[in-house]
């Protein structure tokens, strides 16, 4: 879905009109978060958002998976497979499955580590464990009570923050902020903006870690694209961040087109972009997540990979190691 503009401005007529509905939605969401869930039998680390849309969860999952492997763990991702038609549980096969089957994010992640898609998260736990998981990484699901979490890391974009701070549909929040803050174990702030500073101060005041991080583009791809004029397009939570990252890398963005998050590209849309790039002598560039939905055109579109780097990796490592130790201590008979 494409987020309405009033979600990211000062309180407006639109948001005020929707506040009664938001109050009802928020009350239901808060009550749902209080339910008990399945104990997975292995530590569960959840990477989530307070709000709808993207903020950098997928790069965070990849960074955590890398760290967990360094710690000697076998992480397996558990996802609902948003945008895919398979209810699961199913292990994602990057050769056999398409984004329309399992969702674009799980398909992209499956190129790096084992991923299980299950519309009902609890049903996916046995399959994740069957893949040898010593740790389950939940991609999203912070507000879901289906599986007991041993650590919840919340990702916030430092430029966007929490928008107008209202609960859906008056704003972007998935539930009232207070109960979400109480269930947060660590905050990951992506970028150098100030929009998340107030939330960071509240989390820090609770004695919980605030982890600063930034997206780092692939140096080889940046070198390849410098000197070229590009036509950039993206159907992610915040396409503007992608376009700005290209420009900050010294790449000339001669044209850009933004689509809604998880946009199901039509053949006509892609052929139109390819034709425009050809006419204007531009290189067509998109995100890795978008390219997962565009396999048939992968030879004509250049992906722009990014990784998440933490400013204080030792702090992240200590947090994760401590959480794993405590989780296993609780699960011992």
Where are these regions (language model features)?
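Phosphate/Mg2+-binding loops and adjacent switch elements
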Residues: 81-83, 87-206
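ATP-dependent carboxylate-amine ligase
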Residues: 1-3, 11, 70-71, 147-333
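A transmembrane-helix-recognition feature enriched in membrane-embedded lipid enzymes
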Residues: 1-44
